[in-house]
């Protein structure tokens, strides 16, 4: 059980950082994709 807890403690900051990065990057990425397809 404590192995699962340690894995969660390790993954939680990674997931939070990934979610934060996606939240910041996604709008710009969507604009790039839209401009790519509108050519």
UniProtKB/Swiss-Prot annotation:
GO molecular function terms noted in the UniProt entry: manganese ion binding
Keyword list, A-Z: Membrane, Photosynthesis, Photosystem II, Thylakoid, Transmembrane, Transmembrane helix
Gene Ontology biological process terms from the UniProt entry: photosynthesis
GO CC annotation terms, alphabetical: photosystem II; plasma membrane-derived thylakoid membrane
Localization annotation: Cellular thylakoid membrane
Broad class of where this protein is predominantly found: membrane
InterPro entries named in the record: PSII_PsbY
Membrane-topology annotation of the record: Single-pass membrane protein
UniProt entry tagged with the keyword 4Fe-4S: no
Transmembrane segments: 7-25
Function as written in the Swiss-Prot or TrEMBL entry: Loosely associated component of the core of photosystem II (PSII), it is not always seen in crystals. PSII is a light-driven water plastoquinone oxidoreductase, using light energy to abstract electrons from H(2)O, generating a proton gradient subsequently used for ATP formation.
Subunit and interaction comment: PSII is composed of 1 copy each of membrane proteins PsbA, PsbB, PsbC, PsbD, PsbE, PsbF, PsbH, PsbI, PsbJ, PsbK, PsbL, PsbM, PsbT, PsbX, PsbY, PsbZ, Psb30/Ycf12, peripheral proteins PsbO, CyanoQ (PsbQ), PsbU, PsbV and a large number of cofactors. It forms dimeric complexes.
UniProt family annotation: Belongs to the PsbY family.
Record-given protein name: Photosystem II reaction center protein Y
Name of encoding gene: psbY
């Amino acid at each position: 059980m404590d192995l699962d807890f340690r894995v969660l403690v390790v993954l939680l900051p990674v997931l939070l950082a990934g979610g934060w990065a996606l939240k910041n990057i996604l709008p710009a990425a969507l604009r790039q994709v839209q401009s790519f397809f509108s050519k």
